[in-house]
Amino acid sequence: MRTHNLCLVVDDVRRHRRTTRSEISERTGLARASLTAIIPELVSAGLLKEVGSASGPRGGRPVAALEFDGSRVAVVALEITVGEVIVESVDLGGRTLRIDRAPHGRPIGDPAAVIDTAVDLLLQHLNELDRLSVAFGLGVVVMPAPLAGDPPVVVASSDLGWGRVDLLGQLVARVPRLEGACLLVNDANVAAIAEAAALEVEVGHPLTDLVYLKSLTGIGGGAIVAGNLVTGARGIGFEPGHVLVRAGGKPCTCARHGCFNAEAGPEAVLEDAGLADLAGRAGVTIAMAELVDRARSGDPRTLAALGRAGEVIETVITDLSLAFDPQAVVLGGYWADVFNHLRVSTDLGLGEPSARTIAWTNSDESMPFVLPGRLGARAARAGAFRLAIDRLLSEPTALNNFNG
């Protein structure tokens, strides 16, 4: 009960920014006497701070105001992409503290080389947090690959040519501070969490069911059903890149033919747009940036390639909507940048438009059914931060351990 009440107060202050004890009591139902004990404890833990005064109830004399603090503790996201390692930290209030990047050169089939880069960058980043006198609270490693097991391991990465790799175990062995204080997550799963949260703020009501699809170096995604992320029995649930869209179609890295990734993934679109040579010379990331630029300038071949990819994307969205019946489908990665050029219908259904048997629309018109992501390339890290902060704040008094 005590932890519940502490969390109740923290959550209330986070949502209402500057507030007073009487307002907290009114919203939470906690007695003022309880708050007299709870609030000093949360101030001591660095979660709340007193900030001057606010108008008293019914215009009475000013009273001390409270705000969420969280500036003493950092959460750190280490994201491995197809071309670089990114380490970013924020405090518990979500304020960015530092961001560092380093290319890893995409050494195919050599996880040790990527891990070397990640360790060097992470140690540099943690040393800088020490210099800033901000305590390391929790780390989240973000990986664009299916994960399985408990603790999770990388099952495989077609982008990097990895097989099964105990990425978390190797990082903890070389950075002891991560022991017991680090999570390994799939990039698209945490991006789905972040995009859902961003849309909730935008539309003003909860989103409990959402499908997120993204493409940059491959195709990934995440599904939220009844407020919970779909991970499956083995942790590899919802890998949309390998949904079959064309029997006997183009060969896929998974050894099948006609997978979503093979038919409408980056390499397929780049080849269709005449940018395969650039991808081979400069890498997929640079080629995708060129694709986006050409689309924005109206290049006919690029627009045709994106239109064909959009047809496949729309088919997959329809199939996934039949399976999950989400409130919305969000397209992230480069798809968000070229959303209009994909020509995907924003309101889908089965049957003729005039007599649809099933239609996916939002009756309150607060948002279209299919829409572009809001968070760009930072979506996965934003989701990682949300996950880490929520976990730390679920045990508010434990944060006293981080205060000297």
Task: Set out the residue ranges of the language-model regions.
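Short clusters of small/polar residues that mark proteolytic maturation junctions
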Residues: S53, R101, D159, R234-G235
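Short, acidic, Ser/Thr-enriched surface-loop or helix-capping motifs
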Residues: D91, G149, I224
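ATP-binding/phosphotransfer module of carbohydrate and carboxylate kinases, centering on a glycine-rich
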Residues: M1-P103, P107-N127, E200-G204, F260-G404
